[in-house]
Amino acid sequence: MSKVVDLVRPVVETIIDEHGDMLVDMEYVKEKGQNYLRIYVDRQPNGIDIDEIAALSELVSEKLDTIDPDPLPDPYVLELSSPGAERPIKTEADWKRALNDYVHIGLYQKIDDKKVYEGTLKYYNNDEIVLEVKDKTRRKKLTIPRKLIAKIRFAIEF
């Protein structure tokens, strides 16, 4: 199904870029017998509003209908939305944006007897990250190998 995404991504990205927005992610999935093309869009620095999402959805829908040959020959539902405040960190741009931000991390194996951490991302490279975490009444820096990270996403600190 990613072949569909590969075919429509350039078209969708052009429309989104022309409006000063950013394509965060895109997926084409089948759920309960229904195909969905999901497009996640954001705007820096304050996020994207519902009116802009609606306008982009209309433009993307119209443009997708003109592509020949049709990369989406089966019926599908187009969903355009914001990725949300707690979106996954996937791309290099996401990693840059996450620097000095609060994140949630799930690990493949335990470090210091825990598989889940939340804290401020202080540093990253291809091999490891440094996370500042609360340890009772103080803060400490924890170095985590990237190969141990199962999931990482933005998080809201309470």
Swiss-Prot record:
Disulfide bonds: none annotated. Its main location: cytoplasm. The keyword Cytoplasm applies. It is found in: Cytoplasm. Keywords: Cytoplasm, Ribosome biogenesis. GO terms for biological process: ribosomal small subunit assembly; translation. The keyword Glycosyltransferase does not apply. GO terms for cellular component: cytosol. Required for maturation of 30S ribosomal subunits. PANTHER family: RIBOSOME MATURATION FACTOR RIMP. Belongs to the RimP family. This is Ribosome maturation factor RimP. It comes from Lactobacillus helveticus (strain DPC 4571). The lineage of its organism: Bacteria, Bacillati, Bacillota, Bacilli, Lactobacillales.
